Amino acid sequence: MLVARMQKMKAGNLSGMEKHNKRIFQNHSNPDIDTSLSDQNYDLMNREGKYKDIVTEIIESQKISQRATRKDAVLVSEWIITSDQAFFKNMDPNERDRFFQEATDWFKERYGEQNLAYAHVHLDETTPHMHLGVVPMRDGKLQAKNVFNREELRHLQDELPKHLREKGFEIDRGAEESERKHLSIPEYKKAMESVKELDVERQKKSQEIIKTVSQIDELQSAKSAL
């Protein structure tokens, strides 16, 4: 099953995302990252420079208005492209690389190669995945809401897996909810951790209830013995 999730990146998010995507850190809190494999990661766009400069260049080279870009504007719509571990298991590395290249080619064709800021493929985590950054420019304007409206999100969820199947990959469309709620990988992991915490909390409360019931039974037994 194809996983294609989007997150909106504003100016304040670019630096942190760049550090994550390029592995620019001395210490990290993600236990899923195996730093001994980080040198295998690569960027299919391979643009030089910092995200801020790359994105600014893409916007300024196309925009028709002289107005400054709003500080709260969505500068990048970042897509996380991946599948489950079963899809990648025993896959030839060349085929795996071709999978991400074909996905990138589809984005280039659909949204314009000039608007793709980066396409980082991560091979140093549990499941191979790609962070693909689209600067949502259209008709000389930065307009994330229009470029990725609900209709377009549905189109992407339908057509991207179709394209990949045509290229020889056995992959199905993602769940219907994919175009409604978009979670990044860290957000997904955080959500799963929250579920685990809730389960632990429920178990604790259940144990407390059982303990309380046992204490009541002991008191009643002691009272009956008097």
PLM regions with names:
Residues 1-226:
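N-terminal nicking endonuclease/strand-transfer module with a His-rich metal-binding environment
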